[in-house]
Amino acid sequence: MSMPFYISPEQLMADRADYARKGIARGRAVIVATCTEGIVFATENHSQALHKISEIYDRIGFAAVGKYNEFEALRVAGIRYADLRGYSYDRSDVTARALAHAYAQTLGTAFTTESKPMEVEVVVAELGHDASRDEIYHLSYDGSVAQEHGCVVIGGDQDTIDAVFRSSWEPTMSLADTLTAITQALSQPPQKDAEHTMVTPAPTYEAALLDRSRPRRTFRRLTVTDFVPSTQGTRS
């Protein structure tokens, strides 16, 4: 009589975590950071149709890396949650903290009970009426939540990108200077390719800002002109 195959709970959770991390690492990194104008989200994204950065509600933005169909389902669920809560109570009752807790429940349940964990990493940010009230929440594949201060990098070679970005970024920077620091950080080659010279296409950025100067719906997408420093007075 053959013995039943046994996997310890510790090994099962470790395998699930490794599976999710590998899926997330294949995605291009996203940087979320504060600046004087608000909270900026940015990533490299060559697709014009599939967004990794989106609006959830008046003062709340969403960014994710990993499997697109999974984080898109989270985004849609977040919008429905926010709309229902804002309609049932008051628009001011819709907060990033409550949304992060709802996402944590979904991610945690999938990690422990579903056939496979969700291959996603999520950031939810809420713009405060002043910089001291800005809130940034980082959610991992297992449902764990961390409140970040100032900036966070998810996906890709996040350790290298985070180190490069923090070396040149300050929370009191302008939007233009913050975007310059972001592009420098995102242009870092992955560690495994650092010793190889590769010809790559020019990066295409997806970026958005929760704009503190806007009274209600603060989310606005940034264009390529926002990434180009002003060149007034340089005619030849």
Curated annotation (Swiss-Prot):
Regulation (activators, inhibitors): The formation of the proteasomal ATPase ARC-20S proteasome complex, likely via the docking of the C-termini of ARC into the intersubunit pockets in the alpha-rings, may trigger opening of the gate for substrate entry. Interconversion between the open-gate and close-gate conformations leads to a dynamic regulation of the 20S proteasome proteolysis activity.
Cellular compartments per GO CC: cytoplasm; proteasome core complex, alpha-subunit complex
Main location: cytoplasm
Gene Ontology process terms (BP): modification-dependent protein catabolic process; proteasomal protein catabolic process
Pathway this chain belongs to: Protein degradation; proteasomal Pup-dependent pathway
Record bears the keyword GTP-binding: no
Pfam (any one): Proteasome
Record localization: Cytoplasm
Function noted in UniProt: Component of the proteasome core, a large protease complex with broad specificity involved in protein degradation.
Family (UniProt): Belongs to the peptidase T1A family.
Subunit-structure text: The 20S proteasome core is composed of 14 alpha and 14 beta subunits that assemble into four stacked heptameric rings, resulting in a barrel-shaped structure. The two inner rings, each composed of seven catalytic beta subunits, are sandwiched by two outer rings, each composed of seven alpha subunits. The catalytic chamber with the active sites is on the inside of the barrel. Has a gated structure, the ends of the cylinder being occluded by the N-termini of the alpha-subunits. Is capped by the proteasome-associated ATPase, ARC.
Protein name: Proteasome subunit alpha
Lineage, broadest ranks: Bacteria, Bacillati, Actinomycetota, Actinomycetes, Micrococcales
